[in-house]
């Protein structure tokens, strides 16, 4: 057997393996790998927990969004009903106001017509009295004129009242 470089390389390799076994390097490497595997496993579990939490938050926010949309739709519907009610009420009040104003205007027109008719009648009566006075003054004496005048005034008063 020759003691060449291959032999010394083999002896060095064997000594290296013995030294590694003596220092328990495989156990340390195993522990390190186990620790790394545990760390990765914990990180995966944490990631799964965070994912589930995020999904529950998303579901909660979607539920809240749907509730908010439903509430907004309810508010809009209530506002529309109130606006329609206010519009109908305003229309009714406007119609009542117009009807009252029309009735008041018609009443004022009737009163003005009545006043005009009464004024025309009064003017006609005054004119008739004046004409009768002139005719009677020219045809009758003083005593007869006074009697006729009083009688005519009484008749006019009776007819006007």
Swiss-Prot record:
F-type ATPases have 2 components, F(1) - the catalytic core - and F(0) - the membrane proton channel. F(1) has five subunits: alpha(3), beta(3), gamma(1), delta(1), epsilon(1). F(0) has three main subunits: a(1), b(2) and c(10-14). The alpha and beta chains form an alternating ring which encloses part of the gamma chain. F(1) is attached to F(0) by a central stalk formed by the gamma and epsilon chains, while a peripheral stalk is formed by the delta and b chains. Keywords: ATP synthesis, Cell inner membrane, Cell membrane, CF(0), Hydrogen ion transport, Ion transport, Membrane, Transmembrane, Transmembrane helix, Transport. The chain crosses the membrane at residues 3-23. Its main location: membrane. This is ATP synthase subunit b 1. It is found in: Cell inner membrane. It comes from the Bacteria. InterPro entries: ATP_synth_b/b'su_bac/chlpt, ATP_synthase_B_chain. GO terms for cellular component: plasma membrane; proton-transporting ATP synthase complex. GO terms for molecular function: proton-transporting ATP synthase activity, rotational mechanism; proton-transporting ATPase activity, rotational mechanism. F(1)F(0) ATP synthase produces ATP from ADP in the presence of a proton or sodium gradient. F-type ATPases consist of two structural domains, F(1) containing the extramembraneous catalytic core and F(0) containing the membrane proton channel, linked together by a central stalk and a peripheral stalk. During catalysis, ATP synthesis in the catalytic domain of F(1) is coupled via a rotary mechanism of the central stalk subunits to proton translocation. Component of the F(0) channel, it forms part of the peripheral stalk, linking F(1) to F(0). It is a single-pass membrane protein. It holds the Pfam family ATP-synt_B.
